[in-house]
């Protein structure tokens, strides 16, 4: 009797085949997994994580060129350290210290940005320099357009070719014209136009393997003008006593000390 009822039920309510059950389970799984994959992919795209990081350094007295996979070209001044981070939807360079020239290949969907501490430089297809001095950075535009902003400093500031700004946390100077000869550092020529001695020594330190120390801070504002060979920093230091009331003394540890002339 039971067998008859079982057979009747099977005829009225046929069981799906094993293949059909497998397809049905697969369909339900796909309905669950695909949205999760979409949510995950969207989250990754928004977060824009770095999937590749390269560390580059130039030695004292060395200028180093780097060509990126996207066709952009970087030139590191002496004593410079930076990181190139390739993100999913952006390109980012972190300037840790020193100066670099950026010649950027434009990409609409993968913007290029340089970070120097709290200073952010956004590229719009350009050639520009960023010189980081601790918390202070100088951004100089030679061709194209860049936008500069600082953490806690309000809206982005756009530069025109031949302009520069000084930027630090919470502060961004108005754009000002820059001497075109300042671009010659890429060819090993240092152009100083009434530049404070303290700043000159900071630049020369990139090209000199021994510490250069300004013993008397009062001498820091003294102005230096001229065009010098970056690869001959020792000669530049030897010339300073001829144009300024200073003297250069070599200490027992080999460091060079500038002090007021006796």
Where do the language-model regions lie?
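A residue-level detector for the "anchor" residue at the start of short, highly conserved motifs
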Residues: 10-262
């Amino acid at each position: 009797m039971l067998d008859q009822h079982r057979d009747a039920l099977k005829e009225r309510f046929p069981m799906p085949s094993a293949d059909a059950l497998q397809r049905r389970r697969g369909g339900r799984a796909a309905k669950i997994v695909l949205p999760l994959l979409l949510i995950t992919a969207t989250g990754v795209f928004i977060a824009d994580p770095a999937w590749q990081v390269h560390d580059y350094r130039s030695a004292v007295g060395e200028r180093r060129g780097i060509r990126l996979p996207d066709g952009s070209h970087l030139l590191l001044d002496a004593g410079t350290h930076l990181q190139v981070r390739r993100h999913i939807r952006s390109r980012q360079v972190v300037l840790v210290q020193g100066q670099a020239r950026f010649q950027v290949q434009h990409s609409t969907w993968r913007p290029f940005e340089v970070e120097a501490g709290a200073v952010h430089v956004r590229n719009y297809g350009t050639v520009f320099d960023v010189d980081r001095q601790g918390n202070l950075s100088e951004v100089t535009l030679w061709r194209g357009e860049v936008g500069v902003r600082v953490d806690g400093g309000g809206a982005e500031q756009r530069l025109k070719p031949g302009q520069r700004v000084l930027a630090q946390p919470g502060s961004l100077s108005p754009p000002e014209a820059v001497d075109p000869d300042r671009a010659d550092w890429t060819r090993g020529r240092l152009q100083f136009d009434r530049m404070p001695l303290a700043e000159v020594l900071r630049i020369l330190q990139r090209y000199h393997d021994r510490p250069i120390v300004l013993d008397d801070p009062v001498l820091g504002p003294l102005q230096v003008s001229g065009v010098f060979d970056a690869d001959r920093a020792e000669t530049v230091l030897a010339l300073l006593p001829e144009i300024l009331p200073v003297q250069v003394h070599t200490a027992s540890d080999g460091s060079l000390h500038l002090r007021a002339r006796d």
